[in-house]
Swiss-Prot record:
Gene that this sequence comes from: lysS
Enzyme Commission designation: 6.1.1.6
Binding site for Mg(2+) 2: 420
Main location: cytoplasm
Keywords associated with the record: Aminoacyl-tRNA synthetase, ATP-binding, Cytoplasm, Ligase, Magnesium, Metal-binding, Nucleotide-binding, Protein biosynthesis
Keyword Transcription: no
Subunit and interaction comment: Homodimer.
Protein name: Lysine--tRNA ligase
Binding annotation for Mg(2+) 1: 413, 420
Enzyme class name: ligase
Cofactor note as given: Binds 3 Mg(2+) ions per subunit.
One Pfam family hit: DUF4332
């Protein structure tokens, strides 16, 4: 890396790195460093009356106070932080005091990793600390961390910019309190979910991510190309159709927790790559699945929060069963006053116009129109967990017809905090009906609906061999974690959410500067001074530019021959 691309602190740290090596200290040792305690455990287990406990810990230096022959550092490990008391004569018991005077005081920085061996004690100020007897350099940080300071519970110099936090999650995790806890709770959500399904006797499976047909949901897929087979493939939008094949194959229940991909918009609750759990159980229906879902979410909420309640954006949400159950057409009538029962596509389209819905177009069929009405007027109203049930057949191409309500299906979506959390059916297992549903989807595709499903002939073949009555559900893990941790954006529960490309400062190539008579070695210097394109130099005062670039030459010890003010004036004149 060009030295001009480094900050002053980065240069100092790289020089320190070289000094450590010159002293024979490996700043990145390969050997295992054995630890026997974590910061939180040391504090929790300390008792004043006990014999001093000998510990070996390792972590990152987050703050330090150097006071001559004695110093304090704050060490951060994977569990928390603890104060370490370091004295020159303790870590340098012999005549050689280099480890303290040079290495610790001069060459180590905030962000560096060190190992500490010593004993636990309580300081005169009452803080449980480690009295260091040995210090080992474990990893040198050559880029300074943003240092967040706290006073009276208020954070200063915070690393708060969302774009920076999401791009540099590794920094966010180090410096911002509570971030790591969110992701530990995410792990608890997934672990509790998996344990519950395993205890129920269901089998965790893996199905293809690259699929020849993007089936199982109404969504726009990502497309890629397999060079060897010379075919287009799709990143899966759902696991449904493959999991149902396994039910045909004889499994009692199967589930998969994995990534799905949808080539659609990004917002506070949508990421194009997301984690979903899908479960299919034979001989069950959607009524059983509603009860099972209630028990499952109760258990997860207790595991994460210690109770059946969570708080999101100031709203207390209770996952204690039972949840309200409301047919979708009743919900629409309740919120809009319109009864859509028995209405044709054209009648519903007219209702959309009367409701002054602007996003409606001719490519939308009856199911899509109903979905749009529900999304605009109803969905956001359901804060407490609510099962929206009995969707029209046009909205549910993979769902069994309702046993007593003509034109409707045995489907529910679970709404929580105004968003869909889960989608479930009594699964359609009539192969002839399923084929007709697929054909209707193809008719919608011909009208321009780019979210219509494609016919999956192999899935139809599997159904023809016979699939038992089955209920299935898909639960969005990311949204579930948002609810359980009180987050209001999906980006806060994804380690690395999808981002727009990072903005890169436009810089002219060296050749453009050289056309003005500027030596190639001086181009990075001029750009370091802020003149990233030759046009940036057009109106600058020649003396200012001369002063800027000569100052950089001196500061960074580049040892270039300085141009004269006349030389700089000639460069600028050529631009006029």
């Amino acid at each position: 890396m060009n030295i001009l691309e480094l900050s002053e602190q980065e240069i100092i740290r790289r020089n320190s790195l070289n000094e450590l090596r010159a002293m024979g200290i490996d700043p990145y040792p390969a050997a295992e460093y054995v630890t026997n305690a974590f910061s939180t455990d040391i504090k929790a287990e300390f008792k004043d009356e006990d014999e001093p406990r000998q510990v070996s810990v390792a972590g990152r230096i987050m703050s330090r106070r150097v006071m001559g022959k004695a110093s304090f550092i704050e060490l951060q490990d994977s569990k928390g932080r603890i104060q370490v008391y370091i004295t020159r004569d303790d870590i340098c018991p012999g005549e050689d005091k280099e480890l303290y005077n040079s290495v610790f005081k001069r060459l180590l920085d905030l962000g560096d990793f060190v190992g500490i061996e010593g004993f636990v004690f309580r300081t005169q100020m009452g803080e449980i600390s480690i009295h260091a007897k040995k210090l080992t350099v474990l990893a040198k940080s050559i880029k300074p961390l943003p240092i967040v300071k706290y006073k009276d519970g208020v954070a200063y110099d915070s690393f708060e910019d969302p774009e920076l936090r999401y791009r540099q999650r590794y920094v966010d995790l180090v410096v911002n309190e509570g971030i790591k806890e969110t992701f530990e709770k995410r792990a608890t959500v997934v672990r509790t979910l998996r344990n519950a399904l395993d205890e129920a006797g269901y089998t965790e499976v893996e199905t293809p991510i690259l699929q020849s047909i993007a089936g199982g949901a109404s969504a726009r897929p990502f497309i890629t190309h397999h060079n060897s087979l010379d075919i287009d493939l799709y990143l899966r939008i759902a696991t449904e159709l493959y999991l149902k094949r396994l039910i045909v194959g004889g499994f009692e229940g199967v589930y998969e927790i994995g990534k799905n991909f949808r080539n659609e918009g990004m917002d506070r609750t949508h990421n194009p790559e997301f984690t979903c759990m899908e479960l299919y159980v034979q001989y069950k229906d959607y009524n059983w699945m509603m009860s099972f879902t209630e028990k499952l979410l109760e258990r997860i909420c207790i595991a994460v929060n210690g109770s059946t309640e969570t708080v999101v954006d100031g709203k207390t949400i209770s996952f204690k069963a039972p949840y309200r159950r409301l047919p979708i057409l009743d919900a629409i009538k309740e919120k809009t006053g319109y009864d859509l029962n028995g209405k044709s596509e054209e009648e519903i389209r007219q209702i959309c116009k009367e409701l002054k819905m602007e996003e409606i177009d001719d490519t939308m069929g009856k199911g899509k129109l109903i979905d749009e009405i529900f999304g605009e007027f109803c969905e956001g109203s359901y804060i407490q967990p609510t099962f929206i049930t009995d969707y029209p057949v046009e909205m549910s191409p993979l769902t069994k017809m309702h046993r007593s309500k003509p034109g409707l299906t045995e489907r529910f979506e679970l709404m929580v905090n105004g968003k869909e959390l889960a989608n479930a059916y009594s699964e359609l297992n009539d192969p002839l009906d399923q084929e007709e549903r697929f054909k209707e989807q193809m008719r919608l595709a011909d009208k321009g609906d780019d979210e219509a499903m494609i016919i999956d002939q192999d899935f139809l073949r599997a159904l023809q061999y016979g699939m038992p009555p089955t209920s299935g559900i898909g639960i969005g893990i990311d949204r579930l974690v948002m609810l359980m941790t009180g987050q209001t954006t999906i980006q806060e529960v994804l380690f690395f959410p999808q981002m727009r490309p990072e903005k890169v400062i436009k810089k002219d190539p060296a050749a453009k500067y050289m056309e003005l008579g500027i030596a190639e070695d001086w181009v990075p210097v001029i750009q370091k001074a802020g003149y990233n394109t030759v046009a940036d130099m057009q109106d600058v005062n020649p003396q200012k530019l001369h002063q800027d670039i000569c100052g950089i030459n001196k500061k960074y010890k580049l040892e270039l021959t300085n141009p004269s003010v006349n030389d700089v004036t000639e460069w600028i004149n050529k631009l006029k």
